[in-house]
């Protein structure tokens, strides 16, 4: 693992804060709510960085901020050394291609009117990943990468199980050769037995393509299994940030201790 941290980080966040304005009414003035407070982290090529915290801790807000879905008020986010707040419109497509997300609910993130070939091929065509006459073969490769066969390309989302749908979401996400994959509660909607197979698949793909993961979950045991390092978020703040094994052995914060106790 040590060689992962020998180079420069692919993603660096420096003292980022994100505010939301709460609605004002007749009796109250407009107030701001700090969703992220002074967040700093480094993500290295080939690393899996776990983000753990309860609902409302700021996990998804942080991922949306990294993806430029949300703007942030303070701090700096560098992707491959470049400040993402200064990315120009023409560079945004390339930026978004390099950072892909796998969502929690695979059924909600798949178009029910499209078959699997259409779903996977759409981003390939949009980003011109390969020649037009190579698209079908590319989809065959991707479907094989996620442990399914070619017959699935003609099926529709409603014909698949939850685990199979999540595999399709993974195939679509990796179809554009991203550098960073954000897994946002990407196995929490699946049965426990299916979770393990999808987690193992993500690890296999990481080894094959040297992917870099940000793995977001409220399940500490899942995060420990996947991650090299773990960040614990509480009320928009980082309260713990260390190697996965060390975090369990020597948690720095009482909230981390409570999470560990609750996971057994």
Residue ranges and their predicted role:
Residues 67:
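Helix-to-loop junction immediately C-terminal to a conserved catalytic motif
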Residues 75-83:
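Conserved ABC transporter NBD signature motif
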Residues 156-160, 164:
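Conserved ABC ATPase signature
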């Amino acid at each position: 693992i040590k060689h992962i941290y020998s180079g420069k980080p692919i993603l660096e966040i420096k003292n980022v804060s994100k505010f939301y304005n709460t609605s004002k009414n007749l009796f109250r003035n407009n107030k701001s709510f700090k969703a992220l407070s002074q967040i700093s982290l480094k993500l290295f090529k080939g690393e899996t960085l776990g983000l753990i915290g309860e609902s409302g801790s700021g996990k998804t807000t942080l991922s949306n901020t990294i993806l430029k879905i949300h703007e942030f008020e303070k701090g700096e986010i560098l992707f491959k050394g470049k400040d993402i707040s200064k990315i120009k419109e023409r560079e945004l497509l390339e930026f978004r291609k390099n950072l892909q997300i796998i969502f929690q609910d695979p059924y909600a993130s798949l178009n029910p009117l499209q078959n699997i070939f259409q779903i996977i091929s759409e981003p390939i065509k949009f980003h011109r990943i390969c020649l037009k006459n190579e698209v079908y073969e590319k989809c065959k490769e991707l479907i094989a990468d996620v442990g399914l066969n070619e017959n699935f390309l003609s099926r529709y989302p409603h014909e698949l199980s939850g685990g199979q749908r999540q595999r399709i979401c993974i195939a679509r996400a990796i179809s554009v050769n991203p550098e960073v994959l954000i897994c946002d509660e990407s196995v929490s909607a699946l049965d426990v037995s299916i979770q393990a197979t999808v987690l193992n698949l993500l690890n296999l793909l990481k080894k094959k393509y040297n992917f870099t993961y940000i793995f977001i979950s409220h399940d500490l045991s899942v995060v420990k299994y996947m991650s090299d390092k773990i960040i614990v978020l509480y009320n928009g703040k980082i309260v713990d940030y260390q190697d996965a094994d060390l975090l369990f052995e020597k948690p720095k914060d009482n909230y981390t201790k409570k999470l560990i106790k609750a996971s057994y």
